UniProtKB/Swiss-Prot annotation:
Residues 210-222, 255-271 have a biased composition (Polar residues). Residues 1-103, 123-302, 855-923, 1016-1124 are annotated as: Disordered. This is ATP-dependent DNA helicase mph1. It comes from Aspergillus niger (strain ATCC MYA-4892 / CBS 513.88 / FGSC A1513). PROSITE patterns: HELICASE_ATP_BIND_1 (PS51192), HELICASE_CTER (PS51194). Keywords: ATP-binding, DNA damage, DNA repair, DNA-binding, Helicase, Hydrolase, Nucleotide-binding, Nucleus. Residues 7-17, 169-178, 226-236 have a biased composition (Acidic residues). It is found in: Nucleus. ATP-dependent DNA helicase involved in DNA damage repair by homologous recombination and in genome maintenance. Capable of unwinding D-loops. Plays a role in limiting crossover recombinants during mitotic DNA double-strand break (DSB) repair. Component of a FANCM-MHF complex which promotes gene conversion at blocked replication forks, probably by reversal of the stalled fork. Residues 874-886, 906-916 have a biased composition (Basic residues). InterPro entries: FANCM/Mph1-like_ID (IPR039686), FANCM_DEXDc (IPR044749), Helicase/UvrB_N (IPR006935), Helicase_ATP-bd (IPR014001), Helicase_C-like (IPR001650), P-loop_NTPase (IPR027417), UIM_dom (IPR003903). ATP binds at L341, P342, T343, G344, L345, G346, K347, T348.
């Protein structure tokens, strides 16, 4: 049983049905079965009927005689009719007189079971409220006790009308007056709430319940006998269950966390397709005024035109202003915006408007529009020329075909650029384009901006050098998953999203209806025959895979290239694959390769036709001619089933009338019927510039496109088809260049071709024109591709979409894509699942500047009337490519920087490696002799304690005597286990030098000084610096001589010392030649030039250390011959 308020009927039925219903069958017509919820109340209630009848006889008298007294005991009299309204609380059972005067509401019990089919109000919309709060009835009769806000009816009149309304219940049931009144009130409420900008406040304010209870105290006492077994709160309405509805629902709804980036124009519908009126989620009607956000950021480096900053221009050249275009364009000026609009709703116009205003606001900044293909770029150029009025002289179109030198000149001279993203990133990396000059980047088909696509690289590169630029992203389908949409937002630094669907309220008047016809097909007899023969040919190879547990499928017709690739990877990673012999691995890889190549042919047979399947088998067979092909490939070709299959296919494909797929047959009929209904026959409309209608057919493979074109060409000139494919060349099919693509699009618009058979190249963005019929020859599991295909029609007039699907996988893919699209649209519209980059969206405009909209018709310059694309002209000799230029970001530190500075760590001071100069020793003052010698007491103590070996023997320890054995001390004595130490050798060398000194040493020394002074000039002699090679060798000679002496063997040392002792004194003199060659030092010369005999002799250290400065390098050892 349903009421006008489906939400609350069950609640009141449960409370009242359990307590006050004796015989539910009396509530409705005897022919009508009782409701299921009341059926359980029939038993166990007859005992109380007698007691209740005495109280309810007056109620039965109000009937027309057809109803018995027991009918007043039915549930209807005590159901919602007895439920008080939320505005007051009152007892339900009163005495008979008062009950007769106060007729309450009732539950509508239809006599016919199908009465619900005529009720279109199944779920009334509600103001926002939390789900846990119970809501009262949506519509009630006016309360006679309290005046309403809208209609102030006197109480007696209301009571009288209600008495009359309650007088004849059977008439009310038959004529459904209550239901009509409810429907009219619901429609009136719907219109009122639709016109309100905010949720309506309840019409009546519930007064205090105490006065009402006081006024009816006698009635409560009279009915106590009926309420003894009923709880006090049994008949409480939702007012007692929940707070008053006026203030509570609004704050409760706002307490939920919702995104501030909620887009406009998104409406929520119920399960029955009705609109859920939540004013907070609805877009504001009409045009809105947005201002740039106030941000604290450094001033922009772009030179701004202060005179133009006060306004932003909205072109009105196209006629009527669309509110959604106005609002989106205004928001796109001040935020990094992602615009998701269905195809044909003016994304190009929005982009042209934003480009025009940034062109006005800046003096020399550059604006870049990027699109994946050249046809999409050319399409935007026409919009900027014809709508926005951007001068052609400031515009250029750059692609990879232009030489780098020409592109460099264009970057210096122009301000607006239309190009592909690959060309833009190349110019940025080579320094041809200055990233600091770019102020706006418009990205078309923005759903591609994921991963490492060129769109993402462009934005990242610009962000390194420029923090003051705007991004506008345009797409019809942002993505198929939450992750893909978030990747687009992250890759382009998006801060706001504006999304519209075809059900959005503000675009409904601009969207034409699209009639979608889905046709499913089964395999034909020819296809079943081909599948059986192909399965027999492939079964042996499949069994070999299954025997090694490399593949689990049994049906060869279920093979797919992706499934075989995954199975190969899993087998190679398994233990059996890793431990298998090399020959087994080669065998498995060969079988997987052969089956994967034939899996594509199986897909062609299933979904595209027999002719593409036959072409694929011919190509597969050609690889086995001669010595080509592997063992398993030749095994398939030589199989009897395969040969039989080819014998069947060859005559079929040679027949020009053969149609190898049921979808192709139906496609031919659909296209023919469409053109015949449009009145385009063989001789019709030949004088018109444009045909009456156009058709576009989407296929997945080029083979299918060629087959469809071949079939449709039989019906020329009514059907004039042409293939529309991409640039890359494939086997048996040459690609189309971008110029060829543009030429085909222009001929399609003019009417040279009225049917285009396109692959995926025709899905995205192309303004191909007014297409009245879209035929999807195969389905796509991607919702992006599906929606792109369907968006080609229904732009300016109603369109039709025909989907041709095979039962099974293809049909499931379509359902999956459709559901995925609807779910993603809701997620994107809510905005709660995504993270936006508001910090990456700069204000750019100076603080305090708030541009005002200026709607006006733009004057189109005469130069824009030229139809050619603004490509740079080719020259006989292109300019030389400029050298690479490295642009630096602002506030960059040039020069070399240490790694410790970049890492932020402190740099350790490295000590200076230069040796400190040894200070000159100061002469020590010689102490007195008495201070050095021992005193008599100390001498006595030395002799007593240290010199005496013991008291028994007179053995005294004496000092070492250097004169006891003078000859033996000049040479080291023989040793056995312990060798002489360094001190012993130094002592021996010292004694040897002392022994070499003769009594005439002083005389010889004075003679040398005299000769030296006589041979030198009178000027003061300065010690020369050792700067020559010979000087270095002479200085190192003495050092090496001493090392050689110290490194001699013990026997050799003794022999040398013995010879020195036996040498006469005269032979120990230094040779005169060496004395004259070696320089004298300052300590060896006199300052006043006198050479008398009483001069001071140099000290011993000066004599021994002849070299003041020791060279760092060692010279060769030179042994002087004593005979020289």
């Amino acid at each position: 049983m349903f009421t006008l308020d489906g939400d609350s009927s069950d609640y009141f039925d449960d409370d009242l049905g359990d307590l006050g219903v004796d015989r539910p069958s009396d509530a409705t017509d005897p022919d009508t079965p009782p409701p299921a919820k009341r059926r359980r109340l029939r038993a166990g209630k007859d005992a109380s009927n007698a007691d209740l009848q005495s109280h309810q006889k007056p109620r039965a008298e109000r009937g027309d005689g057809a109803r018995t007294a027991l009918s007043s005991d039915s549930f209807i009299d005590y159901d919602d009719d007895e439920v008080p309204s939320p505005e007051r609380e009152s007892p339900y059972f009163q005495d008979d007189s008062e009950r007769e005067a106060r007729s309450k509401y009732k539950v509508f019990a239809p006599k016919n079971a199908n009465i619900q089919e005529n009720i279109f109000v199944t779920q009334l919309t509600q103001p926002p409220s939390p789900p846990e709060m119970l809501r009262g009835p949506r519509w009630k009769k006016p309360d006679p006790g309290l005046p309403t806000r809208t209609v102030a009816t006197p109480l007696p009149e209301t009571t009288q009308s209600r008495e009359s309304a309650a007088g004849d219940r059977d008439d009310e049931y038959d004529d459904d007056e209550e239901m009509k009144a409810a429907i009219e009130a619901s429609l009136q409420s719907f219109e009122e709430e639709t016109s309100r900008p905010a949720p309506s406040v309840p019409l009546q304010k519930p007064p205090s319940s105490t006065p009402i209870i006081g006024q009816q105290s006698t009635t409560i006492e009279a009915s106590n006998d009926l309420l003894d077994d009923i709880p006090d709160d049994a008949f409480d309405s939702d007012l007692s269950m929940s707070p008053p509805p006026a203030p509570q629902p609004r704050p409760a709804a706002r307490s939920f966390t919702q995104s501030t980036n909620r887009p406009l124009g998104v409406r929520q519908t119920t399960l029955f397709g009705m609109v859920a009126r939540n004013p907070e989620n609805q877009p504001p009607r009409g045009e809105q005024v947005y201002s740039p956000p106030e941000k604290s950021e450094p001033p922009t480096q772009h030179k701004l035109n202060q005179e133009a900053l006060g306004t932003w221009v909205y072109p009105t050249n196209l006629g009527k202003t669309r509110d959604y275009q106005f609002n989106i364009a205004q928001k796109g000026l001040f935020h990094n915006l992602l615009v998701a609009l269905p195809t044909g709703l003016g994304k190009t116009f929005i982009a042209a408007t934003i480009m025009l205003n940034w062109f006005r606001w800046t003096k020399d900044a550059q604006i870049v529009f990027v699109a994946p293909t050249k046809p999409l770029v050319a399409q935007q150029i026409s919009a900027c020329f014809e709508v926005a009025g951007i001068p052609r002289s400031q515009t250029t179109m750059l692609t990879g075909e232009a030489a780098p030198g020409i592109r460099a000149e264009e970057w210096k001279a122009k301000r607006v650029f239309f190009m592909t993203p690959q060309t833009l990133i190349n110019d940025l990396k080579t320094g041809i384009a200055d990233p600091k000059r770019i102020v706006l980047v418009v990205v078309d088909e923005a759903h591609r901006a994921t991963g490492g696509y060129a769109y993402v690289e462009v934005v990242k590169f610009l962000r390194r050098y420029n923090q003051s630029f705007r991004v506008l992203a345009l797409t019809a389908t942002p993505g198929s998953t939450v992750e893909s949409v978030q990747a687009v937002i992250d890759g382009l630094d998006i801060s706001r999203v504006e999304i519209r669907t075809e059900q959005s309220l503000d675009i409904r008047e601009y969207v034409h209806s699209k009639d979608t016809d889905v046709q499913t097909f089964q395999n034909s007899e020819e296809m079943v025959l081909c599948m059986d023969l192909m399965s027999k040919a492939l079964q042996p190879l499949l069994d070999q895979l299954r025997s090694t547990n490399a593949y689990w499928g049994r049906d060869p017709m279920g093979l797919t290239a992706y499934g075989l690739t995954k199975a190969r990877q899993q087998w190679m990673l398994s233990d059996s694959g890793r431990n298998a012999h090399f020959g087994v691995k080669a065998k498995m890889n060969a079988i997987f390769t052969v089956l994967a190549s034939l899996a594509h042919g199986i897909d062609l047979l299933k979904y595209h036709g027999i002719t593409p399947f036959y072409r694929h088998l011919l190509h597969f067979q050609s690889n086995t001619e001669g010595q080509k092909g592997g063992k398993y490939q030749r095994q398939v070709v030589q199989d009897e089933s395969y040969k039989k299959l080819m014998n069947h296919l060859q005559p079929w494909t040679k027949n020009p009338e053969f149609i190898g797929h049921p979808k192709l047959e139906y496609l031919k009929q659909v296209v023919l019927n469409h053109f015949m209904d449009a009145g385009e026959g063989s001789g019709a409309d030949e004088n018109k510039d444009q045909p009456a209608t156009r058709v576009m057919i989407f296929v997945h493979f080029r083979d299918s496109a060629e087959e469809v074109t071949r079939v449709l060409k039989r019906y020329e000139p009514m059907i004039r088809p042409h293939v529309f494919v991409g640039q890359s060349s494939a086997k048996g099919s040459e690609g189309m260049g971008q110029k060829t693509q543009l030429d085909i699009v222009q001929k399609f618009k003019k009417g040279t071709y009225n049917t285009i058979v396109a692959t995926s190249i025709g899905e995205e963005g192309l303004d191909i024109g007014e297409v009245d019929l879209i035929v999807c020859y195969d389905s796509s599991a991607s919702p992006i591709r599906m929606l792109q295909r369907m968006g080609r029609t229904g732009r300016k007039r109603s369109g039709k979409i025909t989907l041709l699907l095979m039962q099974g996988k293809e049909e499931e893919s379509y359902i999956k894509a459709k559901d995925n699209y609807e779910k993603m649209q809701q997620m994107i519209a809510s905005g709660t699942r995504f993270t936006f980059h508001d910090d990456m969206s700069p204000r750019i405009l100076p603080p305090g500047v708030r541009p005002v909209a200026d709607k006006r018709a733009i004057d189109i310059p005469e130069e824009n009337t030229v139809r050619d694309l603004p490509e740079p002209k080719r020259r006989g000799r292109a300019p030389k490519r400029p050298p690479k230029k490295f642009h630096m970001p602002d506030n960059v530190e040039t020069g070399f920087t240490t790694a410790s500075h970049l890492a932020g760590t402190s740099k350790r001071r490295v000590p200076n490696k230069s040796k400190a100069r040894t200070p000159t020793p100061e002469p020590v003052e010689l102490p007195a002799l008495e201070d050095v010698l021992l005193t008599p007491a100390q001498q006595k103590e030395l002799e007593l304690h240290y010199s005496n070996a013991g008291p028994s023997e007179e053995l005294l320890v004496s000092y070492p005597r250097s004169d006891a054995f003078p000859r033996l001390q000049l040479a080291p004595r023989p040793t056995k286990a312990v060798r002489h130490g360094s001190l012993t050798r130094r002592m021996i060398e010292t004694l040897q030098k002392m022994d070499q000194i003769t009594p005439d040493c002083g005389d010889r020394y004075k003679g040398i000084l005299a000769r030296e002074k006589a041979s030198m000039p009178k000027a003061s002699i300065v010690a020369p610096k050792p700067n020559g090679r010979g000087e270095a060798q002479s200085r190192t000679k003495a050092r090496h001589t001493s090392k050689v002496v110290s490194s001699k063997s013990r026997n050799q040392e003794e022999q040398d010392v013995t010879e020195v002792q036996r040498t006469p004194p005269g032979k120990h003199s230094v040779s005169a030649t060496n004395a004259e060659v070696e320089p004298f030092y300052c300590s060896q010369r006199t300052q006043d030039g006198d050479t008398d005999d009483d001069f001071d002799l140099p000290d011993v250290s000066t004599l021994l250390n002849r070299s003041v400065e020791r060279p760092s390098t060692r010279g060769r050892f030179v042994l002087d011959d004593s005979d020289d």
